[in-house]
């Protein structure tokens, strides 16, 4: 049975982010780069978006953590991502995979399955993405999920056990597992699905949390909790137009306040 995340790991994550300010190398999609960078800054991390194949490998060894998000995958970007992951591993730096639309599109599905052999520290995806990554479903409708997070939990657990990693399957309730333990994270607001980039930005915060000391499962679950809390606060402003600035303010005040 999943254990509900309690407030203590979220409070501890805030402290760790302030104390360590991890540098996160975000090889993320073109749609969300600015928002992702601003979210990382709001939580006390430092973002960098280095995507040229000639530089990505070098920088991956410098950064504290690496995020691979395949949302706008290209052939050149795949080369850069592969090199970055390999150099991050050689340097002992954790990397996180966000398998955007895996299962719905064949090229990215094959690429993400290839990357799984390179031992991600964490994986963050919606239910359809995690099911497809685990080989249990054909996938969802692009970036949208057609399954519930609870339905994908067995796939997440199997994937986590097979890869010795932490898997976060996110939705109305998030489930975070290392294959044995499962933490559930409730909260958030439907407005989080009506603006672009909240899931991708969460993956960046997950990447930051994976670089921090302590229990990685709790750190990743706390990252989910931190984002859901900010979403609840930001939704009080009204609609999607006011949501993004309110969300950034809420994150900043949660961590720095």
UniProtKB/Swiss-Prot annotation:
Ligand binding (ATP): 124, 170
- Any one GO MF annotation of this record: magnesium ion binding
Q: Which residues cross the membrane?
A: none
Q: Which cofactor does it need?
A: Mg(2+)
Q: What is its EC number?
A: 2.7.1.50
Q: Can you state which reaction this protein catalyses?
A: 5-(2-hydroxyethyl)-4-methylthiazole + ATP = 4-methyl-5-(2-phosphooxyethyl)-thiazole + ADP + H(+)
Its GO biological process terms? thiamine biosynthetic process; thiamine diphosphate biosynthetic process
Supply the alphabetized keyword list: ATP-binding, Kinase, Magnesium, Metal-binding, Nucleotide-binding, Thiamine biosynthesis, Transferase
Which pathway, per its entry? Answer: Cofactor biosynthesis; thiamine diphosphate biosynthesis; 4-methyl-5-(2-phosphoethyl)-thiazole from 5-(2-hydroxyethyl)-4-methylthiazole: step 1/1
What enzyme class is recorded for this protein? transferase
Q: Which InterPro entries match?
A: Hyethyz_kinase, Ribokinase-like
Q: What Pfam families does this protein map onto?
A: HK
At which positions is substrate bound?
49, 197
Family statement: Belongs to the Thz kinase family.
Its function, per the record, reads: Catalyzes the phosphorylation of the hydroxyl group of 4-methyl-5-beta-hydroxyethylthiazole (THZ).
**What name does UniProt use for this protein?**
Hydroxyethylthiazole kinase
Q: Which organism is it from?
A: Klebsiella pneumoniae (strain 342)
